[in-house]
Amino acid sequence: MLQGINHICFSVSNLEKSIEFYQKILQAKLLVKGRKLAYFDLNGLWIALNVEEDIPRNEIKQSYTHMAFTVTNEALDHLKEVLIQNDVNILPGRERDERDQRSLYFTDPDGHKFEFHTGTLQNRLEYYKEDKKHMTFYI
């Protein structure tokens, strides 16, 4: 039986650069660092970085796959400034209805996509129930 997410692992090309990103941008606490790995605690979530130097990374740019973090509206504005000050690659956001709340998409040094999002699953479901009549809801 599944009990929850155990950890999330990202393949990185430069461990030092990635450690700096995860500490400075995501405010993750570095727990251990090896020659080719690092582990972080991000508000109780175990984040693992493993160095893989010679793998293709172009497909990352072609996918919408990402990890999203919940933030407040006030924090989103501050976090955008942090991203800008640290020369983080900010992605153009997709067009969205204001009922879908606010988001800011960006990448880590290896192109993994992240999102700061001000909404909740409940917000999203309520919006979809109002506006997306083609959808089937099971709750």
UniProtKB/Swiss-Prot annotation:
It is found in: Cytoplasm. The active site is at E115. SUPFAM superfamilies: Glyoxalase/Bleomycin resistance protein/Dihydroxybiphenyl dioxygenase. Belongs to the fosfomycin resistance protein family. FosB subfamily. GO terms for cellular component: cytoplasm. The gene is fosB2. The lineage of its organism: Bacteria, Bacillati, Bacillota, Bacilli, Bacillales. This is Metallothiol transferase FosB 2. Pfam families: Glyoxalase (PF00903). PROSITE patterns: VOC (PS51819). Its EC number is 2.5.1.-. GO terms for biological process: response to antibiotic. Metallothiol transferase which confers resistance to fosfomycin by catalyzing the addition of a thiol cofactor to fosfomycin. L-cysteine is probably the physiological thiol donor. Its cofactor is Mg(2+). The keyword Cytoplasm applies.
